[in-house]
Amino acid sequence: MQNRTLPYFLILPSLLLAAVVIFWPVVHLFEIATHDVNRFGQLREFNDGANFTALFATAEFMNALWRTAVWTVAVVGGALVLSIPVAIILNMDFYGRSVARVIIMLPWAVSLTMTAIFWRWALNGESGMLNSALHGLGLIDTNIQWLASAATAFPMQILVGILVTVPFTTTIFLGGLSSIPDDLYEASSLEGASLWQQFREITFPLLKPFVNIAIVLNTIYVFNSFPIIWVMTQGRPANSTDILVTHLYKLAFRLGKFGEASAVSLIMLAILLVFTVIYIRISTRSEQS
């Protein structure tokens, strides 16, 4: 009997901590989202879901929702595509490999805010490094306002998002590649397999669990990413680069709509929970089959 109850006693402190740190704030968030709230954060009467209705009736929220989906898919997908070949190269035995790994990982150690500040300066339309380089190469005659135009601001932010996500994703894939036995590659080489065949038949299938981990973690990380969008453009021009997390910030701290901001938080939480559960189930079934 004691052996059966011991595991529950061991995990009890963690459950209590999770209840205090996670579950209670979510319950309080739901309470705020379903009530009218004044600018001082005081709850008024129950509004029967009016905050959620108001959100879906506004074009700003719907545009931010769609843009968040584009932002997440593009950044996560782009980081995966770049990180796999980078990890494969860094996993090879060559002179200076340790230095190359450190260089790749360094951006991960820099805060997102500092990275966003650097890129905001580099993409400045008047004195930015990118325009100066393009002028020097003779590729442009007039300055390009990278962050002042909706057509270029959001794509550049996606590019920055990919670049800052690659180091973490590469680290995950390096861990996966190091677990693949070298004997498999040696045997396939003796049988005349090309590098592409080795990747398709050995590397990628054995790397799939790590790909799944990277997709789930990066989706959560990128979906909630605030500094890149906010520091570079604050959602400008005309809210054309807003995603859900920056839209939430504006609702709460610029417009004082704490009820609607809380509703956005709950919607974001629900989206991530549904995605994570569905993706883990699909990936688990595919591995079992």
Curated annotation (Swiss-Prot):
One of its GO terms (biological process) is transmembrane transport. PROSITE patterns: ABC_TM1 (PS50928). The chain crosses the membrane at residues 9-29, 70-90, 99-119, 144-166, 213-233, 258-278. Signal peptide: none annotated. Disulfide bonds: none annotated. It is a multi-pass membrane protein. One of its GO terms (cellular component) is plasma membrane. Keywords: Cell inner membrane, Cell membrane, Membrane, Transmembrane, Transmembrane helix, Transport. It holds the Pfam family BPD_transp_1. InterPro entries: MetI-like, MetI-like_sf. Its main location: membrane. Belongs to the binding-protein-dependent transport system permease family. The complex is composed of two ATP-binding proteins (BAB2_0493), two transmembrane proteins (BAB2_0490) and a solute-binding protein (BAB2_0491). Probably part of an ABC transporter complex. Probably responsible for the translocation of the substrate across the membrane. This is Probable ABC transporter permease protein BAB2_0490. It comes from Brucella abortus (strain 2308). The lineage of its organism: Bacteria, Pseudomonadati, Pseudomonadota, Alphaproteobacteria, Hyphomicrobiales.
